[in-house]
Swiss-Prot record:
Pathway: Cofactor biosynthesis; tocopherol biosynthesis. The keyword Transit peptide applies. Its EC number is 2.7.1.182. Belongs to the polyprenol kinase family. One of its GO terms (molecular function) is phytol kinase activity. Residues 1-62 form a transit peptide. It is found in: Plastid, Chloroplast membrane. Signal peptide: none annotated. It comes from Oryza sativa subsp. japonica. This is Probable phytol kinase 1, chloroplastic. GO terms for cellular component: chloroplast; chloroplast membrane.
Length: 314
């Protein structure tokens, strides 16, 4: 009986032994493949040691800098990091929506156009009252300038970014409207900052006014302007209304925080004239020569300076 059972035992145990052999051969093949690229392993190890070494060397300097930094500098650094992360997340979120075809490319581009300026302005009170605060805030548009130059000059590629912020999906388009936009953000921070209504009104007209003009004009702009077939009556009216309302809202926001004074009985009429000037400039058929992201804020800055002055809205 025992002798008869042996073949059965062998049959039962044979698959297990074969699976073990297969597993062993698989492990050996993996080991061979790993050993087959010692250069890659050495490079990876070198990169790890380099990163750890740089981190270890920089840690004391970072700790010393943090210990010697003033509370205002720490606050400004934290605000810069937070806003930079928010700006990157905003663009990436609409990248994803565009890639999944949940939103049209042109609509995505203009929503990013509107939100970028509005959210950036709204975040300015996060910075301290130090004289250096504006330079920390300027880091955010400066990084975006570098990013747009990098992809616009094809030094690197980011197809999702290109699709979400350009009209035709071409990298070189990043060097026009989007780049002009962030340059205006940079200039507004460095020249006007929170103490002047000029930069705030200019960004409101560029982001909100021009942005809503395109959104509404594309959908409902069948009646074109007689002197510019690329612009519509409804789009221009939308720019005037949205730019005026957003400018008034942002002036109210910053005046409530005490950055400047607004005499509302005079300011609203002057603000309407500024919005009208920006709308007229946006209607002029010179977009092939001067981009709207340059002409609109420049016209707004000039009109606001003539009507308001530098530091008040009275």
């Amino acid at each position: 009986m025992a002798a008869a059972a042996r073949p059965v035992d062998v049959v039962r145990h044979f698959p297990c032994s074969s699976s073990v052999a297969a597993s062993s051969s698989l492990l050996l093949s993996r080991s061979k493949s790993r050993l087959a690229s010692p250069a890659a392993a050495a490079a990876s190890s070198m990169r790890r040691r380099l990163v750890l070494g740089v981190g270890a060397a920089a840690a004391p300097a970072v700790a010393a800098l943090a210990a010697s930094a003033t509370p205002a500098a720490l606050r400004d650094c934290a605000a810069t990091l937070l806003i930079t992360a928010g700006a990157y997340s905003l663009v990436r979120a609409f990248d994803g929506l565009t890639a999944r075809r949940l939103i049209e490319q042109n609509l995505s581009r203009k929503i990013v156009h509107v939100l970028s300026g509005v959210l950036f302005m709204s975040s300015w009170p996060l910075f301290s009252n130090s004289t250096e605060a504006r330079f920390f805030a300027a880091i955010v548009p400066l990084l975006n300038c570098i990013r747009l130059l990098t992809y616009g000059l094809r030094l690197s590629t980011d197809e999702a970014l290109v699709k979400s912020v350009t009209r035709e999906g071409k990298p070189e388009e990043l060097l026009r409207g989007p780049l002009y936009y962030v340059i205006v953000l940079l200039v507004s921070v460095l020249v006007f900052w929170r103490q002047s209504p000029i930069g705030i009104v200019s960004l409101s007209m560029m982001s909100g006014g021009d942005g809503f003009a395109d959104i509404v004009g594309r959908r409902y702009g069948s009646a074109k302007l007689p002197f510019n077939e690329n612009k519509s009556w409804i789009g221009s009216i939308s720019m005037f209304i949205s730019g005026f309302l957003l400018s008034a809202l942002m002036l109210f926001y910053f005046s409530c925080l005490g950055y400047f004074t607004v005499c509302w009985d005079l300011a609203l009429g002057k603000l309407a004239l500024v919005a009208l000037a920006a709308t007229v400039v946006e209607c002029i058929p010179v977009n092939d020569v001067v981009d709207d992201n340059i002409s609109v804020p420049l016209a707004t800055m000039l009109a606001a300076y003539l009507l308001f002055g530098y530091s008040s809205c009275c």
